[in-house]
């Protein structure tokens, strides 16, 4: 259960679900998530939701509007919504591009981490940023 938090970050899970359970299964998961947010959201406190996912056709970015619909369906209001991207081509519709796609932590990441964990030097994700009240 989600209790006592006001920030939710979802990393590349949406595209996995999109492939595994399809659009209808993903809508059901979004519905479940939205209902749990309503049950566990702190009173009188906004909630920040940040979703990072693949920025390519028929992946997580295409399902972002489904999540927004479910948030509104359960009676929450979105006070802030931004769609962001790093790519300058074939990008997420309606999104704003970041000026730079270089990993801001690149100089701080030890070489062994880059090797062991395949740390990306450049970002190519699509982002949905929501403030829910």
Language-model segment annotations:
Residues 1-133:
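Domain-level detector for long C-terminal conserved domains
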């Amino acid at each position: 259960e989600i209790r006592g938090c006001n920030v939710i970050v979802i990393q590349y899970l949406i595209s996995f679900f999109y492939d595994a359970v399809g659009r209808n299964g993903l809508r059901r998961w979004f519905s479940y998530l939205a209902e749990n947010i309503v049950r566990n959201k702190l009173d009188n406190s906004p909630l920040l939701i940040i979703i990072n996912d693949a920025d390519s056709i028929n992946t997580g970015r295409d399902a972002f509007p489904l999540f927004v619909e479910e948030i509104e369906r359960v009676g929450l209001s979105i006070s802030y919504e931004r769609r962001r991207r790093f790519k300058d081509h074939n990008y997420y519709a309606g999104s704003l591009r970041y000026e730079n796609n270089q990993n801001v932590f690149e100089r701080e990441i030890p070489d062994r981490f880059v090797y062991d964990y395949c740390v990306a030097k450049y970002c190519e994700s699509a982002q949905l940023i929501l403030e829910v009240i």
